[in-house]
Every structure is written in structure tokens, then in C-alpha cells.
Curated annotation (Swiss-Prot):
Belongs to the RecO family. Coiled coil: none annotated. InterPro entries: ARFGAP/RecO, DNA_rep/recomb_RecO_N, NA-bd_OB-fold, RecO, RecO_C. GO terms for cellular component: bacterial nucleoid. It comes from Anaeromyxobacter dehalogenans (strain 2CP-C). One of its GO terms (biological process) is DNA recombination. The gene is recO. Pfam families: RecO_C (PF02565), RecO_N (PF11967). The keyword DNA repair applies. The keyword Cell membrane does not apply. This is DNA repair protein RecO. Transmembrane segments: none annotated.
Length: 254
């Protein structure tokens, strides 16, 4: 069968049988794909350490008859992001970003925007300790790529301007709520004016804006809670990596 080359980030690697491994990649060419790496555990000569999560690699794959899994024939590391692997906070944030990317997209649907965003965020983690603003920017960018962006520039229910004061946020309604709509929605979350402004800057400027956005408490907590609720609403659950971030503490980037 014809072989093709893909460039992708390892989102997950799962041991299979005694010697094999199944890897899930977010690729530039085909979106999310899974590939069967025969003998990956038995010998490191063929794949080396290239199949570790968060590795950016170039892979040669082929279709496998009767299987949704591609066959992984050879790989080479494009970028290993070695610096982030020595720090628990960076690993936790990278794991969360990888799991979020995996859950937001379907198989074999190209997502150039999300691929570029994930590579950029892993690069940021490789270069410096995790910043809460960068993780919020990644979440917002991933939601945009998936077509699920929360409404922050106006009321998600009626479309009216939300003004410059504090607002409420509701995941089910789709974002921020004005003073007229919020009382009719139970269990909304607070967003101070400064928190909303910071989220709007991150929504507009992405990871580049995160470099100059402190997002300190309590704004950091409000932003985290709002986006976590929004993601849980659309995914139907809290991601395992999100729970781990909660356990090790928001100061590590969560």
C-alpha cells in the first residue's frame, strides 16, 4: 500500500499487547489519527523515544486493510520539547492541552488552526514556566478551532452590550449575560469587569497576548472556572488532565 508522510504531535500513546503501541496524533495533514506501532515496546531501535506524548514528529504511515488504525512504519523527531518534561507543572499543562485537543476534534478531519496552536503552546511551555493566561488563551483558541467560542463581547442570550461592569457567565447559555438576562438563569458564575476584559484580550490576541496578561487572582480563578464550566458543558465531563491540574494547584498554570 502507498505510504504517506504526516507531521503530527503525539496526543496519547497506549501499550498494546506485549510489544506494540497505539499512538494518537494530531497531524497537520489529516487532523486526528491513530496508528499502530508494531514492536514499539520490544525494541527502541525502530522508533526510539519519538512516540512519547507531546513529541512533534514526522511519520511515515500506511493504510491497514480492515482497520481504522494506520500502520506506523517510521518516525523522526521534529521537536522533542525536552525542557517541559522536567517540570511537573509544564507536564500537567501539556497533558491537559493534548487531552483537550484529542477530545475536541473527530478523526480524520483536518484542523490546521488547532495543530498550529498546540505546537505553539508546547513551544511556550518548553521555553518558560506555565502561565495561567497562556492556558486560558489555548483553551479559547481550541474552542475557536472547534467552532465553540463562548460569547464574551455581548450578552449570549439577547445580544445586548454587557457594559463595563461585572457580568455573569453561563455555559449553557453560551457565555456572558447582561444584567437583564442573568437573573433568569440559575447558578451563573461571576465575571468581574477586569476578568471579562482579560478574556476578551486573550480571545482576540491568543498566545501572543498572554505574554503581557498577568491574569492574577481573583481574575485568574474566575476565568478558569468560567472556561472549565464551558468546556465541561460541551464535552459532557471534566477531563482527567483538568482534574490533575486542579490537584496540583492553579499556580502551576491551571
Amino acid at each position: 500500500m502507498d505510504r504517506v508522510k504526516l507531521t503530527g504531535v503525539v496526543l496519547r500513546a497506549v501499550d498494546y499487547g506485549e510489544s506494540d503501541r497505539v499512538v494518537t496524533l494530531l497531524t497537520a495533514e489529516r487532523g486526528k489519527v491513530s496508528a499502530f506501532a508494531r514492536g514499539a515496546r520490544a525494541s527502541r531501535r525502530r522508533f526510539g523515544g519519538a512516540l512519547e506524548p507531546f513529541t512533534l514528529l514526522s511519520a511515515e504511515v500506511r493504510e491497514r486493510s480492515g482497520s481504522d488504525l494506520l500502520g506506523l512504519d517510521s518516525v523522526s523527531v521534529v521537536r522533542g520539547f525536552g525542557a517541559l518534561r522536567g517540570d511537573l507543572g509544564r507536564i500537567a499543562c501539556a497533558g491537559y492541552a493534548a487531552e483537550l485537543a484529542r477530545e475536541l476534534v473527530r478523526d480524520h478531519q483536518p484542523h490546521d488552526e488547532l495543530f498550529d496552536l498546540l505546537v505553539a503552546y508546547l513551544g511556550a511551555l518548553d521555553a518558560a514556566p506555565p502561565r495561567p493566561a497562556a492556558l486560558r488563551a489555548f483553551e479559547l483558541g481550541a474552542l475557536r478551532a472547534a467552532g465553540l467560542m463562548p460569547r464574551l463581547d455581548a450578552c449570549a442570550r439577547c445580544g445586548a452590550p454587557v457594559g463595563e461592569g461585572p457580568v455573569r457567565f453561563d455555559a449553557g447559555e453560551g457565555g456572558a449575560l447582561c444584567g437583564g438576562c442573568a437573573p433568569g438563569v440559575p447558578r451563573t458564575l461571576p465575571l468581574a469587569a477586569g476578568t471579562l476584559a482579560a478574556l476578551l484580550r486573550l480571545q482576540e490576541g491568543g498566545l501572543a497576548a498572554a505574554a503581557s496578561e498577568p491574569l492574577a487572582a481573583p481574575a485568574g480563578r474566575e476565568a478558569r472556572e468560567a472556561l472549565t464550566a464551558f468546556l465541561e458543558h460541551h464535552l459532557g465531563r471534566r477531563l482527567a488532565a483538568r482534574r490533575f491540574l486542579d490537584e496540583i494547584g492553579p499556580l502551576l498554570g491551571g
